[in-house]
Design a protein with these regions (language model features):
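Short, internal active-site loops enriched in acidic
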Residues: 129-131
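N-terminal catalytic or cofactor-binding beta/alpha core of small enzyme domains
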Residues: 2-127, 136-147, 152, 156-167, ...
Length: 193
C-alpha cells in the first residue's frame, strides 16, 4: 500500500443492528475501538447513517476502510477485502437513490462522488451474511468471522502506516498479536452479551 500522505485513515462500520448479520460492520468497529490504534486512525460506527458517512468522507482521508456485511455468493462468514473503484461524477452510480435511513456502500460512494469527494484508497472488508432478517444478534458463522475481520483491518493498517501497530515496528510482535486476536475478540463478545 505504501506510505500515506497525511496519515488520515477512516475505518467505518455500517449496518443495521436490527437485521441480524447486517450488524457485522458495527460489531467489528466496536471491537476495533476497544483496541489501541495508530495515530491518525479514526474508528467510527456509522450504523445506518450512510449520508453522514458520505459527508464525513468529504473531510479528506488517505485511506478509507468500510466494514460491512455484503452478499457475494460465498459461504456465510467468509471475509473478503475488496478494492473500490470510485465512480466518476457522470457515472450513473454517482447518482444514488437516497434513503435517509440507509444507503448501500455503492450508494455511499455514488453520493460522495456526486458531492465532489474522493477519498484516497478505498477498501471494503466484507463478510458474507447468513441472515439479514429482522432480529438481534449475529448468526454463528458471522460471529465466528469477527476475529478474521479485525485481523484484516489491522493488517491493512499495518501495511498502510509504517509501524502501523501501536508501539511496534511493522514486523515486531505481529505473530504474537495474531495468535491472541481470536481469543481477545471472543472474550470481548462474551462480556458484551
Amino acid at each position: 500500500m505504501g506510505d500515506l500522505m497525511t496519515g488520515r485513515i477512516l475505518v467505518a462500520g455500517v449496518g443495521n443492528v436490527f437485521l441480524r448479520d447486517d450488524a457485522f460492520g458495527v460489531e467489528v468497529v466496536r471491537l476495533l475501538a476497544e483496541r489501541p490504534q495508530p495515530p491518525g486512525v479514526q474508528i467510527r460506527d456509522f450504523g445506518i447513517r450512510g449520508v453522514h458517512l458520505a459527508y464525513e468522507l468529504l473531510n479528506g482521508y488517505d485511506l478509507f476502510v468500510l466494514v460491512d456485511a455484503a452478499p457475494r455468493g460465498e459461504a456465510p462468514g467468509t471475509v473478503s477485502v475488496l478494492e473500490v473503484d470510485m465512480p466518476g461524477p457522470e457515472d450513473p452510480q454517482a447518482q444514488p437513490v437516497i434513503d435517509a435511513h440507509s444507503l448501500t456502500p455503492d450508494a455511499v460512494f455514488g453520493l460522495l462522488s456526486s458531492l465532489g469527494g474522493h477519498p484516497g484508497r478505498s477498501l471494503v472488508v466484507a463478510c458474507e451474511p447468513a441472515e439479514v432478517d429482522a432480529g438481534m444478534g449475529l448468526t454463528d458463522p458471522v460471529r465466528a468471522a469477527l476475529p478474521d475481520a479485525v485481523r484484516a483491518v489491522e493488517e491493512i493498517l499495518a501495511e498502510a502506516i509504517p509501524g502501523g501497530r501501536p508501539g511496534e515496528g511493522p514486523e515486531e510482535g505481529r505473530a504474537a498479536e495474531q495468535a491472541t486476536d481470536e481469543q481477545e475478540c471472543m472474550a470481548d463478545l462474551a462480556t458484551s452479551r
